[in-house]
Amino acid sequence: MTDFTLSDLEKIVATRARAAPEESWTAKLVAAGQTKAAKKLGEEAVETVIAAIGEDRKNLVDESADLLYHLMVVLNIAAVPLQDVMSELARRTSQSGLQEKANRQNP
């Protein structure tokens, strides 16, 4: 078990995003812009789905790590703090999933 958290990842992404693009993949991706970063996020999402369907546990773990990393990059570019996402998850999980979905459809 590790003590590493998504907050740790968010901080690492923020630090590396400020580096020179020739020194950091994160900085290079951030410099390429949100469209490029979002496409990479989508690619990683598809690879994660394929790993899940293929029941390949090791690959699913690896692709999930890539997916979370690229999500943090997209959030960083959009200036959306992880805490905003976590707050939304907390709000949604304070009620049943079916009730939450109904509330979104009938505001």
Curated annotation (Swiss-Prot):
Enzyme Commission numbers on file: 3.6.1.31
Coiled-coil segments: none
Single biological process term from Gene Ontology: L-histidine biosynthetic process
Cellular compartments per GO CC: cytoplasm
Similarity field: Belongs to the PRA-PH family.
InterPro entries: HisE, PRib-ATP_PPHydrolase-like
Species this chain originates from: Rhizobium meliloti (strain 1021)
Enzyme class at the top of the EC tree: hydrolase
Protein name as annotated: Phosphoribosyl-ATP pyrophosphatase
Catalytic activity line of the entry: 1-(5-phospho-beta-D-ribosyl)-ATP + H2O = 1-(5-phospho-beta-D-ribosyl)-5'-AMP + diphosphate + H(+)
Highest taxon listed in the record's lineage: Bacteria
Keyword Nucleotide-binding among UniProt keywords: yes
Pfam families on file: PRA-PH
Annotated localization: Cytoplasm
Keywords: Amino-acid biosynthesis, ATP-binding, Cytoplasm, Histidine biosynthesis, Hydrolase, Nucleotide-binding
Pathway: Amino-acid biosynthesis; L-histidine biosynthesis; L-histidine from 5-phospho-alpha-D-ribose 1-diphosphate: step 2/9
HAMAP family membership: HisE (MF_01020)
